[in-house]
């Protein structure tokens, strides 16, 4: 048997032509018989428990229920591979073909695809340039539509007619003296199929482009919307009439199974009930057409077939929801595909992978931005192959089994080896839902105690994470190529800007902003206290750690004499208040300590004194003064202090600061 695996790059949903639908379901057996059409609503025979022929579980269409065994039992064993049984017509092959072989139901009347009729926007209504309500009235047999107006004066193409109006026109057409010819009206999906088939997409697109050039406002937007749909049809090579179905694909039976429960009862997929309704109504319609039943009965049956197909494709999208036992809505094909528990998100995107784990995240403020804290328990499991390889290479163990025993015992050598292994080996962290590419980023792992993953608070906006119980998944890139890619493209420190807006996504918030504010805040009430002088920032931090000072105590920190301090005005010029418009004016001045303008707030230094070598030196304070509009001094703050020689050369200078500001300054410098 040929391999069933086939590589592909992507999955694309599009319109299938009637020929393609039949091609999915039809197969020619080795003996030349064409099979594939499901004609009976039966599933299995309740006496023999074998699938009914031409039913929803037919072995001739979908393949044998048991490996290498035909329906009647004439051929058994693998030696009969590929033989088609003369009695039952079943090909002898593996039963797993029932997972991918499809069938089809040939419809006695066309039906519309509910996605394209009732979707938002409705592609049928847009293409036909008709209101959705009118299109629905045609599909569900509430109104006629004019397909050919002929030579009738009051009729126009695509005009809607009620039943009474059409009966009057019909009387006119068939009267003896009537000269009206060429009038054709339709109802139901058949009429829509004709209207859609009459569309010449290239001509319509050209017309719309001309109209758009001469239109404005809402009309222009509507025309652009229609042109976009038509261009998409042209680009994909799809035809509008394919939105009306002549045949319905039947998915493989193993994807809608029927299983026997204890006590002889059966549990079945909802799809089987929905398919059964379609087949029953389709067969009934075909019989009514054969016996030439009245038009009103056939029309009603066509409407019921349309509703059955709607329920199969998307139950509840239009009309009443079809329910099963206990008034539970039946799961249609759309329900199986869409949503969090659907095929795509649950089964295709949500697969379990090796070398991954997940745990609760907690804040790791001491981490670098490109680091994450990985619990030891998780790290030893994720990096086990690398650890085992290194243990064997270092000669600590002889084989894999011995290495695993050493790991289980928690030998100290194992943790040393693990530290070596994770050094320079990035891991990827992902937080669901991954709505943009920054939802998964790479970090350098740091081993931590406990069972929670530590995350740097600055990367939280990218993941939309907070620490109220959020979980994150860890993935280990195995190959050297994937490790290099993670390091170069996905490392958190390389993803500073949002790909959507181009603005920084790594922005401090909440506790970080509050912490920065608290560290840099000033308490001016403490300025008048005794001045504390420190030679360097480390001494200030040491005094703070020993509880000699607190975060907001004003301290004089020595600076190198050549460090320039910016001021608003030249030194020793008293404030000159001429015209003030602001409510509060702030200026910064250098003034001697014995200045008459300002009080000597820190009087422990004399303004002028002699040094040991006889040089005359003078002390200056850098004042920050707040004035009112009238020029009255409201507040005075000392910002710096200098000691200068008589020639103006600065010998010593101090800046007034706080331990909190020194801490934040050193923290920022250490990570730059």
Swiss-Prot record:
Superkingdom in the source lineage: Bacteria
Co-factor binding details: Binds 1 Mg(2+) ion per subunit. Binds 1 Zn(2+) ion per subunit.
UniProt entry keywords in alphabetical sequence: DNA-directed RNA polymerase, Magnesium, Metal-binding, Nucleotidyltransferase, Transcription, Transferase, Zinc
Annotated binding of Zn(2+), by residue: 70, 72, 85, 88
Cofactor(s), names only, from the UniProt record: Mg(2+); Zn(2+)
One cellular component (GO) term of this entry: DNA-directed RNA polymerase complex
MF annotations from Gene Ontology: DNA binding; DNA-directed RNA polymerase activity; magnesium ion binding; zinc ion binding
Annotated EC: 2.7.7.6
Binding residues annotated for Mg(2+), in chain numbering: 466, 468, 470
GO biological process: DNA-templated transcription
Catalytic activity: RNA(n) + a ribonucleoside 5'-triphosphate = RNA(n+1) + diphosphate
Function noted in UniProt: DNA-dependent RNA polymerase catalyzes the transcription of DNA into RNA using the four ribonucleoside triphosphates as substrates.
Family, similarity comment: Belongs to the RNA polymerase beta' chain family. RpoC1 subfamily.
Quaternary structure annotation from Swiss-Prot or TrEMBL: In cyanobacteria the RNAP catalytic core is composed of 2 alpha, 1 beta, 1 beta', 1 gamma and 1 omega subunit. When a sigma factor is associated with the core the holoenzyme is formed, which can initiate transcription.
Official protein name in the record: DNA-directed RNA polymerase subunit gamma
Species per Swiss-Prot/TrEMBL record: Trichodesmium erythraeum (strain IMS101)
Gene name for this UniProt entry: rpoC1
């Amino acid at each position: 048997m040929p391999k069933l695996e086939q590589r592909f790059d992507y999955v694309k949903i599009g319109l299938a032509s009637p020929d393609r639908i039949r091609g999915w379901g039809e197969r020619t057996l080795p003996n030349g018989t064409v099979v594939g059409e499901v004609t009976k609503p039966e599933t299995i025979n309740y006496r023999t428990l074998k699938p009914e022929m031409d039913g929803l579980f037919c072995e001739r269409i979908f393949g044998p229920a048991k490996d290498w065994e035909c329906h009647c039992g004439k051929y058994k064993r693998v030696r009969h591979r590929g033989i088609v049984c003369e009695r039952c017509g079943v090909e002898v092959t593996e039963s797993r073909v029932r997972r991918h072989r499809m069938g089809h139901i040939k419809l006695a009347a066309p039906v519309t695809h509910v996605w394209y009729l009732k979707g938002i926007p409705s592609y049928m209504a847009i293409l036909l340039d008709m209101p959705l309500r009118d299109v629905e009235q045609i599909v569900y047999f509430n109104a006629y539509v004019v397909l050919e107006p002929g030579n009738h004066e009051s009729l126009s193409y695509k005009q809607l007619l009620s039943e009474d109006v059409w009966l009057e026109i019909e009387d006119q057409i068939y009267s003896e003296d009537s000269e009206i010819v060429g009038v054709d009206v339709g109802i139901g999906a058949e009429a829509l199929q004709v209207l859609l088939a009459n569309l010449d997409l290239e001509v319509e697109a050209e017309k719309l482009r001309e109209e758009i050039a001469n239109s404005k406002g809402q009309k222009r937007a509507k025309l652009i919307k229609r042109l976009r749909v038509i261009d998409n049809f042209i680009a994909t090579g799809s035809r509008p009439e394919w939105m009306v179905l002549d045949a319905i694909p039947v998915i493989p039976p193993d994807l809608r199974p029927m299983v026997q429960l204890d006590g002889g009862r059966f549990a079945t997929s909802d799809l089987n009930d929905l398919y059964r309704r379609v087949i029953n109504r389709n067969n009934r319609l075909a019989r009514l057409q054969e016996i030439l039943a009245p038009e009103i009965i056939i029309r009603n049956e066509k409407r019921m077939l349309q509703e059955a197909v709607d329920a199969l494709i998307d139950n509840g999208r239009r009309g009443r929801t079809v329910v099963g036992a206990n008034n539970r809505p039946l799961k249609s094909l759309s329900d199986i595909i869409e949503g969090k528990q659907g095929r795509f998100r649950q089964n295709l995107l949500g697969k379990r992978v090796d070398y991954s784990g997940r745990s609760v995240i907690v804040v790791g403020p001491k981490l670098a931005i490109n680091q994450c804290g990985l619990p030891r328990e998780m790290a030893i499991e994720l990096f086990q192959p690398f650890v085992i390889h290194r243990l064997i290479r270092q000669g600590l163990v002889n084989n894999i089994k011995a290495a695993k025993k050493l790991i289980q015992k928690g030998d100290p050598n194992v943790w040393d080896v693990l530290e070596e292994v994770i050094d320079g080996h990035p891991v990827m962290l992902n937080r669901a839902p991954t709505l943009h590419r920054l939802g998964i980023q790479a970090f350098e792992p740091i081993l931590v105690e406990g069972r929670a993953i530590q995350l740097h608070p600055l990367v939280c906006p990218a993941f939309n994470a907070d620490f109220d119980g959020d979980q994150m998944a860890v993935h280990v890139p195995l190959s050297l190529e994937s490790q290099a890619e993670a390091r170069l493209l996905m490392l958190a420190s390389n993803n500073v800007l949002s790909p959507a807006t181009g603005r920084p996504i790594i922005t401090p918030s909440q506790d970080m902003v509050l912490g920065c504010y608290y560290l840099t805040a000033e308490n001016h009430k403490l300025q008048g206290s005794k001045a504390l002088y420190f030679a360097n920032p480390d001494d200030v931090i040491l005094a703070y750690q020993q509880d000699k000072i607190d975060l907001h105590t004003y301290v004089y920190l020595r600076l190198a004499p050549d460090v320039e301090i910016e001021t608003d005005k030249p030194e020793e010029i008293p404030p000159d208040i001429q015209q003030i418009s602001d409510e509060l004016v702030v200026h910064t001045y250098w003034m001697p300590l014995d200045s008459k303008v300002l009080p000597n707030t820190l009087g422990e230094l004399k303004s002028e004194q002699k040094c040991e070598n006889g040089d005359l030196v003078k002390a200056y304070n850098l004042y920050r003064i707040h004035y009112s509009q009238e020029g009255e001094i409201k507040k005075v703050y000392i910002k710096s202090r200098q000691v200068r020689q008589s020639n103006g050369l600065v010998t010593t200078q101090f800046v007034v600061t706080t331990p909190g500001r020194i801490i934040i300054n050193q923290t920022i410098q250490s990570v730059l």
